Regions:
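Conserved AMP-binding/adenylate-forming core of the ANL superfamily
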Residues: 23-75, 79, 83, 100-105, ...
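Hydrophobic alpha-helical segments in the ANL/AMP-binding
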Residues: 11, 76-95, 104-105, 206-210
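Conserved pre-ATP/AMP-binding loop-to-beta segment of ANL
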Residues: 18-21, 142, 147, 161-183, ...
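Structural core segment of the AMP-binding/adenylate-forming
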Residues: 87-157
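Conserved structural elements of the adenylate-forming
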Residues: 40-48, 175, 194-215
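Conserved AMP-binding A3 loop
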Residues: 33-36, 179-205
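Conserved S/T- and glycine-rich ATP-binding loop of Class I adenylate-forming
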Residues: 68, 85, 116, 178, ...
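A short N-terminal helical cap/helix-turn-helix that marks the beginning
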Residues: 1-22, 41
């Protein structure tokens, strides 16, 4: 079946074109590789953990859906956290790593972000420097292991009941639900959030594929 929501793409690849190396990044000077199967498993287990935080899409409106933010450079965990968030109906709010603390606090409050991922100590410290003034922000999880911070792996749960809930919820996510808020850099004023739906982003992917053809094969 053709993907309709962004997170459908992982299952689509797993069924038709599973890769031994879907994602890769250097960790401590050595390449860490992730297969499609491992990515899919991690995404689902992270979704299960996010459910235990009480997060959901609620009524699937931009106002009613819960939000999770991320401040990070490009890395495999970014994609996996993104898909895990979206497939339970929660809106993803990426923040540029170069965003200053004032704009960061504004974005988190404006989007009513409840939880956040930060990639490393520098960005974690930046988030923690504004946390007290962002009343809606409950907790920050990190990709790197940082003393005193909660590591994102704590949220990856292999619980059969929770994983079944994730599968049920995935089927209910409408294609026209907002998948992400993308904030402008704020160079001419306060950052402004742009709402992008699953449908709109996936349509752009399909049009890009037609403009720059590549085969549906490994």
């Amino acid at each position: 079946m053709e993907p309709k929501r962004l997170f459908d793409c992982i299952e689509h690849q797993l069924k038709l074109f599973p890769q031994e190396v879907m994602l890769a990044a250097k960790e401590n000077g050595a390449w860490r590789k992730y297969s499609t199967a491992e990515v899919a498993q991690t995404v689902n287990s992270l979704s299960a953990g996010l459910l235990t935080l009480g997060l959901s899409g609620n009524d699937f409106t931009p106002e009613g859906s819960d939000k999770i933010a991320i401040i990070s450079s490009n890395r495999p965990e970014w994609l996996m956290a993104d898909m895990a968030t979206q497939q339970i109906g929660v809106i993803w709010v990426p923040v540029y790593p170069t965003t200053n603390p004032l704009e960061l606090a504004f974005i988190l409050k404006d989007a009513s972000v409840q939880y956040m991922f930060a990639s490393n100590k520098e960005l974690y410290d930046k988030v923690m420097s504004v946390k007290e003034e962002v009343a809606c922000l409950k907790e920050v999880f990190t990709f790197d292991r940082i003393p005193g911070a909660k590591h994102w792996s704590e949220l990856c749960l292999q619980d059969a009941d929770l994983l079944e809930q994730v599968n049920v919820i995935k089927k209910t996510i409408p294609v026209d639900q907002v998948a992400t808020f993308i904030y402008t850099s704020g160079t001419t004023g306060k950052p402004k959030g742009v709402m992008l739906t699953h449908q709109s982003v996936y349509f752009n992917l399909q049009m890009g594929k037609k403009s720059f053809p590549f085969p549906d094969a490994p």
